Amino acid sequence: MSLQLGVIGTGAIGQDHIRRCSQTLQGCRVVAVTDIDPQQAARVLAGLTLEAEVYPDGHALIQAPEVQALLVTSWGPSHEEFVLAAIAAGKPVFCEKPLAVTAAGCRRIVEAEIAQGRRLVQVGFMRPYDAGYQALKAVVDSGRIGEPLMLHCAHRNPRVGENYKTDMAITDTLIHELDVLRWLLADDYVSVQVLFPRKTGKAHAQLRDPQIVLLETARGTRIDVEIFVNCQYGYDIQCEVVGESGIARLPEPPQVQLRSAASLSSAILMDWKERFIAAYDVELQAFVDGVRAGRVGGPSAWDGLAAAVAADACIEAQQSGAIVPISLPQRPALYA
């Protein structure tokens, strides 16, 4: 029997997930939606020729008896409220990032889930579901390159809008690396420093771009991440793990190699959706399959908290220029 989903928020990512659950994934169907603009929700359903109930608000949808599990894809500051309500109702919930806009909010969610005594929350960090990252982790975990000593990473976007501010390089961009690199190494961060190279002339006046984030883990691995959101040439994600006896590199997305006019070339993607579209499919299918099997896996509320704590330290490091410690409380048994 199909898992009956309710979706809170029908903006761009909400629409994409509704389409995905209705047309691509197996074992689920969207039976209820809500949005701050009910007419927007109705338009999304009509555009997908989908029959589902439009509820006046997220709380009404969460309490709806036909809704068995939730997708929270609304405005970021509303996530904590709806995730806590879903936990209180005992319903599994997939929450797009951020889990909450503050580390304190993430802690409240962790505490509520612990009080329930079981995992109900999966956070929408999709990179661990990317085939390239999974292959890279398999090499790291196998020991073929020895212990990881250093990571060299980059997160580059062709350009960003005028509303993109310096701290968003952490909260909107680096947040993906903060999650996936911790997963890749199975290691927590202990400190961070942020450096600002010469500013690109392509950035608007209020944005300092590029940035270099230097992280250290509990086991002593050093990580440098270049954040360059006005690189012009494409959407480019790089990750190289330097081990004791070898180097492992994240594979490039498969593209046709072209030999023509005395040159050898292959295309670079321009959009993050193209780069990770398969990972989005896999992560949501994993959520659906897990709930149907009576469990929730994937990135947890604890992982959401870890990313938020690290992000707060990164922003402090942006502002101070100092090396800032990153301190997580002891991991609760629920997330062991």
Swiss-Prot record:
Residues annotated as transmembrane: none
Reactions performed catalytically: myo-inositol + NAD(+) = scyllo-inosose + NADH + H(+)
Molecular functions per Gene Ontology: inositol 2-dehydrogenase (NAD+) activity; nucleotide binding
Pfam families per record: GFO_IDH_MocA, GFO_IDH_MocA_C
UniProt xrefs under InterPro entries: Gfo-Idh-MocA_inositol_DH, Gfo/Idh/MocA-like_OxRdtase_C, Gfo/Idh/MocA-like_OxRdtase_N, MI/DCI_dehydrogenase, NAD(P)-bd_dom_sf
Keywords: NAD, Oxidoreductase
Enzyme kind, highest EC tier: oxidoreductase
The keyword Oxidoreductase belongs to this UniProt entry's keyword annotation: yes
EC numbers: 1.1.1.18
Top-level division of the source organism's lineage: Bacteria
Alphabetical GO biological process terms: inositol catabolic process
Assembly mode: Homotetramer.
Protein function: Involved in the oxidation of myo-inositol (MI) to 2-keto-myo-inositol (2KMI or 2-inosose).
Record-stated family: Belongs to the Gfo/Idh/MocA family.
Name this polypeptide is given: Inositol 2-dehydrogenase
